[in-house]
């Protein structure tokens, strides 16, 4: 049962991720709210992670990096 749930989750993530690659417009990174009780300034810069086969993605989130590894291309927005 857990295997089925896991597979359904992975397939739905892949479909959503694949759909993002063909949509027009770049939505950019999402800023996160600072945790309670934090001390000092918190950086809101997007996480920079190069993914294999995805050299056009310079600053992407963890989800988009996972999508790049899965499909071998940038999933945020295709330019041109």
Curated annotation (Swiss-Prot):
- What GO molecular function annotations does the UniProt record carry, in alphabetical order? chitin binding
Its keywords, alphabetically, are: Antibiotic, Antimicrobial, Chitin-binding, Disulfide bond, Fungicide, Pyrrolidone carboxylic acid, Signal
Q: What is its main location?
A: cytoplasm
Q: Where are the transmembrane segments?
A: none
Pfam families (UniProt xref): Penaeidin
Q: Which cysteines are joined by disulfide bonds?
A: 54-67, 57-74, 68-75
Q: Keyword check for Disulfide bond, yes or no.
A: yes
Q: Name one GO biological process term.
A: killing of cells of another organism
Q: Where in the cell is it found?
A: Cytoplasmic granule
Quick one: a GO cellular component term? cytoplasm
Q: Where is the signal peptide?
A: 1-19
Q: In which tissues is it expressed?
A: Strongly expressed in hemocytes, and to a lesser extent in heart, muscle, gills, intestine and eyestalk. Lowest expression in hepatopancreas.
List each coiled-coil range.
none
Protein name (database record) = Penaeidin-3
* Source organism of the structure: Penaeus indicus
* Native organism taxonomy: Eukaryota, Metazoa, Ecdysozoa, Arthropoda, Crustacea
Gene that encodes the chain: PEN-3
């Amino acid at each position: 049962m857990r295997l089925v749930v896991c597979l359904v989750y992975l397939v739905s993530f892949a479909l959503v991720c694949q759909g993002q690659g063909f949509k027009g417009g770049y939505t950019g990174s999402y800023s996160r709210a600072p945790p309670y009780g934090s001390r000092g300034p918190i950086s809101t810069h997007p996480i920079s992670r190069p993914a294999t086969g995805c050299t056009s993605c310079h600053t992407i989130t963890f989800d988009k990096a996972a999508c790049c590894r899965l499909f071998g291309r940038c999933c945020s927005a295709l330019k041109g």
